[in-house]
Amino acid sequence: ATTMAIPFYPCSHQQGHIAAAAWSAGRMDLLDRPHLVWHLSGGTTELLHVVPDGVLVKATCIGGTTDISAGQLIDRTGKRLGLAFPAGKAVDALSREAAHRDSFRVKVHDASFSFSGLENKMNALAQQGTSPADICWFVLASIIQGVETATRQALEQYPGLPVLCAGGVASNQLM
């Protein structure tokens, strides 16, 4: 930054995801006011309450998974189905070929939930011979259901706040 005479803002990995998501959504204005952010990546599934903090933002976790992340579940699904790692793009593409569009109701309490039951159900479907496309749809639709329910619960506590999604998992077509 010094060599190029540009500002340097030290930030966390999470703050970087939040800023990148705001920029790519064309909503840099969100960084100047409170909002909610889903950080959905390979290792993180967190619902954050974000407030301005000087030139950066401060994020407080208010929900998300209590065990494995959405990205881990998607990659485990891909591995189970023999797909390449990381499996996000392949699971996303395969889900669009699903003939049966079922989902699992993820139990959400205070905007928090667990994906271990969903992982067990995915493994059971694979053992039963369910088509890979149907399994991919099932997993993604179930993740989305959990995220949507947690978002609704959080908006009861933080009414009217906009919601932004950040991270690689958030880029799938169903999301």
Model-derived regions, located:
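Short beta-strand-loop/turn "lid" adjacent to the catalytic site in phosphate-handling enzymes
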Residues: 1-2
